[in-house]
Amino acid sequence: MSNLFDATALVVPFEKLRMTDVEIVGGKNASLGEMISQLPSGVKVPTGFATTAHAFREFLKFDGLTERINAKLDALDTEDVRALAAVGAEIRAMVEAQPFPADLETAIREAFVTLQGGQPDASFAVRSSATAEDLPDASFAGQQETFLNVHGIDEVLHKMKEVFASLYNDRAILSLIHISEPTRH
């Protein structure tokens, strides 16, 4: 960890991220932070913020979502393609319906106001940067959603849930189960 932010942070501005933060914010976010730190060298990178792996775990723990997801995954016959599709759709719907914990939503809203900088027509990208995407023994790259031209905090919050839910697409569920990815439990 780069020591530029608290380990229990829910949201971190890119400016405070470094490559040493991959396990906390994922490879894409850490790379953006590293590039921003090189701005004096002439590198131009759009600013932003990342939600942390801790924030994602808190989101999943809220209202027992982790237990409900794990119950679905534990009962899943991964050889049954129809069951996989049905369970995946159920889990994604559960994630998208899950409210944010109040402290996480507040942190996101505050970071958004700072990022928006008084420009109400600004548009944003909401994308994954899963901590497992860039690990040498796992290949999750390209499995999670990316949304461009997102306007306003309410749409950002909604798209964030869709990105979280995309961790449970059918291919990702199989990957999670077969490599026993720690985010499952």
Predicted regions and their residues:
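Short "domain-exit" segments at the C-terminal end of structured domains
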Residues: 181-185
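N-terminal beta-alpha lobe that positions the nucleotide/phosphoryl donor
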Residues: 1-176, 180
